[in-house]
Amino acid sequence: DQRTRGATLNAAIAGLGPVSVKVGQTLSQRPDLVGEEACEALKSLQTKNRPFSNAAALQSVAVEFKLNSTANVAPNIGGLPASQCLFASFSEEPAAAASLGQVYKARTHDNREVAVKVQRPDALRTVAIDYTCFAVVWKLIERWWSFQRKLKGEGPFDNGDIGDVVDTVADGLFDELDYDLEALNADKFRESLDFLGFVDVPTFLPELSTNRVLTTEWIRGAHLEALSVKDGALMTQLAVEACTASLVLTGYVHADPHEGNLMLREDGKVVFLDFGLMSGVDGYIMESFAQGIRACLAEDYESLARAFQDVGFLTTPLQFRENPKQAYELYDTPNGLDQFASELREAMATTEGGTSRFGALA
């Protein structure tokens, strides 16, 4: 059944390493590339990943902070007095595991609950090797499919943007490995959206952090899957408003806002996590997004189509295909954008939820 297929797919991807997991997380938000069923299956990669060994994590902490041994991480780990340990306590199992690291719950000597993110051993080397393998294999696949299409007299092979997805993910992964950069990104993101009043970021503890170990305050809250329908709708609304403000007002965007990187805190604020992937938005793109939102609210689909083209959602000149299995072709007609606007209007009117607040267009 679908659940079994999804579990099998996720297990296979997790076994291929962090680059595969990150590509899977990215594709979980692209039903246009992999289909709805695959997207649903891949979503579990956002919050459920295979952890690496606790011994390796403790060893990384000991090395990063130049401790005598892993026993000096916390009293409950090695039985040493608290005065000889980095933390007052440190969980024996990870609270969460991600593609490049895992998080432990700890307590500082001044009694603060904190989250300690420890990078996977040899993460940089693994990412570099995985990406190289991906790039080489994908090039071979592209050439083989192009050759097969040429033999059949068909048009050029359309890679469906998968190659671009892999390149983008790999670039971002190298940034994610720099925890110093992530801490700076988090502070900048908090400051950029402070005016909203309902967005927060975990406070960074520099004295307990390094380039490969990141310590922040422990967030008391829940991810979307653990929330009630009412609270889930609230978090979704707050997250959408925050992301929209980033796109059209601040120009500083969290580039990986999937379910695993969002929490609703007990005080009702939405908390963003994981700031390894960030992006800056040019002013003209911000203006085009704003125009697109205004056009959508006014149901002005001609202006919305132009905004799509301005931000790059549509190519110039237009390209189209009848179905996902066909290659894109140039839509070489003088009224191509008007026809697209007409089809967009029809789709929004006939698709279930098409004109609702979080409907088909979202």
Protein language model features and the residues they cover:
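Histidine-centered phosphotransfer motif of kinases
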Residues: H254
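Broad phosphate/nucleotide-binding scaffolds in NTP-utilizing and phosphate-metabolizing enzymes
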Residues: D1-S246, G251, E259, M263-G283, ...
